[in-house]
Amino acid sequence: MIVSIDVDAQKTFTPLCPDELPVNEGHLIVEELNAQAALADLRVMTKDAHHMAAKWLVDNPVDMLKPTGFSDADLTWVAHAMVGTRGYELLDGLPSVKEYDYCVWKGVDPELHPYGACFHDIEEKLSTGLIEWLRCQNTNMVIVGGLATDYCVKTTVLQLLKGGRWQVIVNEAA
């Protein structure tokens, strides 16, 4: 079974939300993500889903990426992908949430700020169920694309490599 994973393909990581965490041309990955999904049997969506009371929040971008001292929210970040905001939304042109075969919402708990899609916590003790679901699907290949490469895509790929006996392909849309 081949599974395609859209990692955090949300407006928060695009120029559409310039005050959040925009990735240059991030909004242009939709066509590539849809092409990768066409090669797969199943499709997974991951989404950052943050709370306004998150303990890692800072108001000023100058204060970002500083250690927090918390084990499951290691760095400070400006508000992004807050549930109910434009940044939380999937990119236009992607399927609706109900059209995906499996969904992972990350960072819902204000105490946690995970990067990868396989665990709710940085210490990798609280599974999101993704690895287990992939095993139940008899997955032999995973194609990963999304935003942003340096944190969420990278961590998801590393977790997938440790978590199963499948090939992991990183798409250029990452």
Where are these regions (language model features)?
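Active-site acidic carboxylates
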Residues: 1-107, 136-140, 158, 162-170
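Short acidic/polar capping segments at secondary-structure boundaries
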Residues: 11, 109-110, 147-150
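Short, well-ordered secondary-structure micro-motifs
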Residues: 56, 114-117, 155
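Short, surface-exposed loop/turn motifs that are enriched in glycine and acidic residues
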Residues: 79-84, 119-123, 146
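Histidine/lysine/aspartate-rich catalytic loop segments that bind and position anionic ligands
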Residues: 96-137
